[in-house]
């Protein structure tokens, strides 16, 4: 038997329904904020991610599905969504006149890492990207959008924010941080690599020993230039005035190298240990990194599997819906086929083409998770009626077929 690859799984039935619910909720909120859908390829040139995500990131260092294709191109399956959307923005020459574009996307991402709860090798993300807007109000708007999504999904989260500064103040901060890191010994292998490539990523280490080593590290907030400090304070003011609770976290740097200025994460403890379920920030330099004209960008990405894991614990995803329509005699199949065609204009209909006894039909309706059971037998046909049963309330009665739409 051929099985799915390790860390990759099918979405079927209840899981597929839950996936659709999460994506639909995200899409509805994103559209209300003026965002439109973009769909980018799953396969891109590897250099796109080496330039954008950064050589110091775990993704580029050890997690990419990378290979050489038949034409000799070094390509990889996308490990995240932002770089591809930025590439699309530049390729369409929208960067030349700083076009304002607001896009949302969703789909598969791929990382070769150890599979665990809420973390797969093929996983799904929902994300948004906004281009051409410098104002910190856009950063706040992106955060408010995510907050609204979680409210609609009834998921409790905690928001953490930070400012990574711009190129100028980050340069000063890195010098102080490097001096501090060089005075410490005992970092893990990942931190030793990060220290050489991008020292600020050491702050992102989840190793308890490393966290203890850096507990007195220089603070980003104390090294921001006046402009970045003003924007960070303004962001906090906007969030507070709009009823958004948050925590300022000096060690929040995100796992990708392209962030600058605003960075944020939404944390939930409803998946077990506190884990990030969404995060993002501003990446004004990324467009320039990818050979575009220097501009503005901000966005977020959400891990759909982690959201689904929370909802599975909180909600009854097997809530009944739809109509199961059947007949007890083959002579009436044509009748229910025509009736199904009419009902499907407004309702979800499961149609059985086989004539069976009532008990067997009821069993199939239960397996289909239908809410309404409709069946025609000889007696019903003679009276131009149909047998109706609500599988939630167990109410049952005969209804005139001509009045069926009004009764449903």
Swiss-Prot record:
Entry protein name: Histidine--tRNA ligase
NCBIfam families: hisS (TIGR00442)
One Pfam family recorded for the sequence: HGTP_anticodon
Cystines in this chain: none
Encoding gene, per UniProt annotation: hisS
Taxonomic source organism: Campylobacter lari (strain RM2100 / D67 / ATCC BAA-1060)
BP GO terms, sorted: histidyl-tRNA aminoacylation
Keywords, alphabetical: Aminoacyl-tRNA synthetase, ATP-binding, Cytoplasm, Ligase, Nucleotide-binding, Protein biosynthesis
EC number: 6.1.1.21
UniProt superkingdom: Bacteria
Location relative to the cell: Cytoplasm
């Amino acid at each position: 038997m051929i099985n799915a690859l390790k860390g990759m799984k099918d979405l079927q039935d209840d899981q597929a329904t839950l996936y659709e619910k999460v994506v639909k909720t995200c899409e509805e909120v994103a559209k209300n904020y003026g965002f439109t859908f973009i769909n980018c390829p799953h396969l891109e040139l590897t250099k796109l991610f080496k330039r954008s995500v950064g050589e110091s990131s775990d993704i580029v260092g050890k997690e990419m599905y990378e290979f050489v294709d038949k034409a000799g191109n070094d390509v990889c399956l996308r490990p995240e969504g932002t770089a591809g959307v930025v590439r699309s923005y530049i390729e369409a020459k929208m960067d030349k006149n700083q076009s304002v574009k607001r896009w949302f996307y969703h789909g598969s991402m791929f990382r070769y890492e150890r599979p665990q709860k809420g973390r797969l090798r093929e996983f799904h993300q929902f994300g948004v990207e906004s281009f051409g807007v410098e104002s910190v109000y856009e950063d706040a708007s992106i955060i408010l959008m995510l907050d609204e999504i979680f409210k609609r999904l009834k998921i409790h989260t905690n928001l953490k924010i930070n400012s990574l500064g711009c190129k100028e103040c980050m340069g000063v901060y890195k010098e102080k941080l490097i001096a501090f890191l060089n005075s410490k010994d005992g970092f893990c292998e990942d931190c030793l690599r990060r220290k050489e490539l991008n020292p600020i990523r050491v702050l992102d280490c989840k190793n308890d020993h490393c966290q203890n080593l850096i507990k007195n590290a220089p603070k980003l907030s104390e090294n921001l230039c006046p402009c970045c400090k003003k924007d960070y304070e303004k962001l906090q003011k906007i969030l507070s005035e709009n009823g958004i609770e948050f925590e300022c976290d000096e060690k929040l740097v995100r796992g990708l190298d392209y962030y600058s200025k605003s960075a944020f994460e939404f944390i939930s403890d409803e998946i077990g240990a506190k884990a990030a379920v969404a995060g993002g920030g501003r990446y004004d330099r990324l467009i320039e990194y990818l050979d575009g004209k220097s501009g503005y960008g901000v966005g977020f990405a959400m891990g759909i599997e982690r959201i689904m894991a929370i909802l599975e614990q909180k909600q009854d995803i097997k809530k009944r819906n739809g109509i199961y329509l059947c007949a007890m005699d083959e002579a009436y199949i044509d009748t229910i086929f025509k009736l199904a065609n009419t009902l499907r204009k407004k309702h979800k209909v499961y149609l059985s083409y086989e004539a069976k006894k009532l008990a067997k039909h009821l069993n199939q309706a239960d397996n289909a998770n239908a809410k309404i059971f409709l069946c025609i037998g000889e007696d019903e046909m003679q009276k131009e009626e149909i047998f109706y049963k609500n599988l939630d309330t167990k109410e049952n009665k005969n209804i005139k077929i001509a009045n069926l739409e009004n009764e449903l």
